[in-house]
Amino acid sequence: MSVVTRIAPSPTGDPHVGTAYIGLFNHTLAQQARARGEEGKFILRIEDTDRNRYVPDSERRIFQMMAWLGLTPDESPLQGGPNGPYRQSERTAIYGEYARKLVEAGHAYYAFETPEELAALREAAQQEGRVIAVPSRDLDPAEAQRRVDAGESAVIRLKVPREGETVVNDALRKPIAFQNREIDDKVLLKADGYPTYHLANVVDDHLMGVTHVIRAEEWITSTPIHVLLYRAFGWAEPIFAHMPLLRNADKSKISKRKNPTSVEWYMAQGFLPEAMLNFLATMGWTHPEGKEIFDLAEFQRVFRLEDVTLGGPVFSLDKLRWMNGKYLREVLSEEEVAERLHAYLASQKHDLPDDDYFRAVVRMMIPRMDVFSEFLEKTPYFWSEDYPVSEKAQHLIEEGRPFLPELAARLKNLPSFDPATTEAALRAFAEERGLKPGKVMQPLRAAIAGTSESPGMFELLEVLGQERVVARVERAARGG
């Protein structure tokens, strides 16, 4: 069976994690069809008909997000394809043609009400607890056509049946029945020739051969309109599956007020795309073997649409950070982490040499960071002598100042600076002074790193190197 899926984001702002989430499942269904030897196609089209909210750079950023995630579409405005154009703003003539076909068939009508008239009609309908009744619905079609031909401004509205019900079949739910009397006559084509979401969505999905409409559950209430349109055109309906919405911890719909929703924020923070995909895959779905860490290929191997659960999945930033840390420590090799961290730092305009010193610092920090943006925050003392000294570290330096000059001399005279040598020397130094080792090592750490928290002392000494360590201890001893 052919599987043709799509996502249709609107270029109205930041590329949203919700687009990535829905894109993952649509991409996966198409890939699974290919793996079975069937046709599988994933389409990305741009729904840019809301010109009031259009943001010029947003489309490029959507493509950038999809490329970062590795969810490459088979057809899109970028690479084209047999079903183009893929921007709705370039398809207005198509929508006008199909809207007029519905008028000719008696499934839609021209409506001439002014905004003021519509406001009054809506108020009356609200007071009476019913959907709006549009007078133009009862106009003689020939009279309506004459007015349009004369240049009068009109929209085209769907003529929803007055009686009966429209049933939505959803692959994740029991059939949902909507009473037709509670569905208003939606505008399909605006007076300026631009379509509404409902018409453009259905026409595009049909003409592009979409077989599966996988989208967020917020579109369920729009689906009876789409079902009525499919029936009015005489077209077969696709399979609908409405995915659970991503939620904040309080179960409210995810929003940037409570969680970063722009994928660009996660990119800038240094999250890995593999971890983001892994995390999004667990939103409403559980690996059949209980695995928490798995790659995209594994997800495509075991995912089944019918296994999606509908309880609102919580988008936990803490869980995503934990998962990203697992990738750094357990999935990627040290070499891969170093290479990708260096590329990330370069993208953030931090020019560090990719040398043995850099890689030694990376090796120490892998257990101590969850995302790449933490790397420089936690390692300023590796890259500059002008590193910050915390208040606690300053206090520790003051405590150790009586013995720091002698400690500097002892470290300076060591024949080597490997961990075994420095550990033995520091423990001997503490014992000679009748101190516990920590009473020596804590001021030393504060002096060479400006913090009371750092990687293991002896590894830290080796990576910083004897010359740098001695100079810093001498400076701290002088009170500098």
UniProtKB/Swiss-Prot annotation:
Subcellular location: Cytoplasm
Binding sites annotated in the UniProt record for ATP: 256
Keywords: Aminoacyl-tRNA synthetase, ATP-binding, Cytoplasm, Ligase, Nucleotide-binding, Protein biosynthesis
Motif residue range(s): 'KMSKS' region: 253-257
Source organism, top-level taxon: Bacteria
UniProt cross-references to InterPro entries, sorted A to Z: aa-tRNA-synth_I_cd-bd, aa-tRNA-synth_I_codon-bd_sub2, aa-tRNA-synth_I_CS, aa_tRNA-synth_I_cd-bd_sf, Glu-tRNA-ligase_bac/mito, Glu-tRNA-synth_I_codon-bd_sub1, Glu/Gln-tRNA-synth, Glu/Gln-tRNA-synth_Ib_cat-dom
Major localization listed first in the record, in broad terms: cytoplasm
EC number: 6.1.1.17
Tagged with keyword ATP-binding: yes
Coiled-coil features, chain-numbered ranges: none
One of the record's GO cellular component terms: cytosol
Short sequence motif named 'HIGH' region, residue ranges: 9-19
Record-level GO BP terms: glutamyl-tRNA aminoacylation
Pfam families in the cross-refs: Anticodon_2, tRNA-synt_1c
Catalytic activity: tRNA(Glu) + L-glutamate + ATP = L-glutamyl-tRNA(Glu) + AMP + diphosphate
GO molecular function, one term: glutamate-tRNA ligase activity
Function: Catalyzes the attachment of glutamate to tRNA(Glu) in a two-step reaction: glutamate is first activated by ATP to form Glu-AMP and then transferred to the acceptor end of tRNA(Glu).
Family that this chain belongs to: Belongs to the class-I aminoacyl-tRNA synthetase family. Glutamate--tRNA ligase type 1 subfamily.
Full protein name: Glutamate--tRNA ligase
